[in-house]
């Protein structure tokens, strides 16, 4: 599978397992985050890319992912002007020995918004826990914009989301 549309690109080997799951192997993608604005009120700029040895999808849920997602030149595109955030990476791996579920470790490569945290998903639920520190995390307008999902603290804010599919 290979597709290029503008600055966006997707490449992967696609297979279908007898249990109904779809598997992408040797997968890579590049997406400009501006594309997301067509679907979500996401005020984030930058280049999103990923490389995966494998991604397994069953009944619409990612059941296994081995790879990395990177956000380069991340920018909060605020009405008052763009706020540079930085470069980030999420390393994904299998959640357990049965390879059912995925965990991700978020880290900051460089930037004025320092993010660290974990993500996990199974067939039925997900959990996201992120800590944000640094100068941008203490910026009042940015904190206000994040207040829908974030809990302020002395150093910045925390995001803790859990849910079921």
Regions found by a protein language model. Name each.
Residues 1-2, 21-25, 68, 97-105:
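Short, hydrophobic/aromatic-rich segments at coil-to-beta transitions
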Residues 1-43, 47-55:
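N-terminal beta-strand/beta-hairpin edge segment
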Residues 26, 73, 108:
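Residues on the solvent-exposed faces and adjacent turns
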Residues 37-41, 79, 104-106:
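Outer-membrane beta-barrel domain signature
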Residues 41-43, 83, 110:
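Transmembrane beta-barrel outer-membrane domains
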Residues 62-102:
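Short helix-loop boundary/capping segments
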Residues 85-165:
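Extended terminal
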């Amino acid at each position: 599978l290979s597709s290029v549309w503008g600055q966006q690109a997707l490449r992967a080997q696609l297979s279908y397992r007898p249990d109904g799951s779809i598997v992408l192997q040797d997968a890579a993608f590049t997406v400009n985050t501006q594309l997301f604005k067509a679907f979500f009120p996401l005020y984030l700029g930058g280049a999103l890319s990923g490389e995966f040895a494998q991604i397994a999808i069953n009944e619409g849920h990612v059941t296994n992912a081995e790879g990395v997602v990177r956000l380069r030149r991340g920018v909060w595109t605020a009405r008052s002007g763009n706020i540079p955030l930085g470069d980030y990476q999420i390393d994904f791996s299998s959640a357990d020995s049965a390879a059912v579920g995925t965990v991700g470790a978020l880290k900051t490569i460089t930037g004025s918004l320092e993010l660290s945290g974990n993500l996990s998903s199974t067939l039925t639920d997900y959990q996201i826990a992120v800590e944000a520190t640094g100068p941008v995390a203490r910026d009042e307008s940015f904190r206000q914009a994040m207040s829908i999902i974030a809990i302020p603290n002395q150093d910045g804010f925390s995001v803790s989301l859990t849910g079921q599919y």
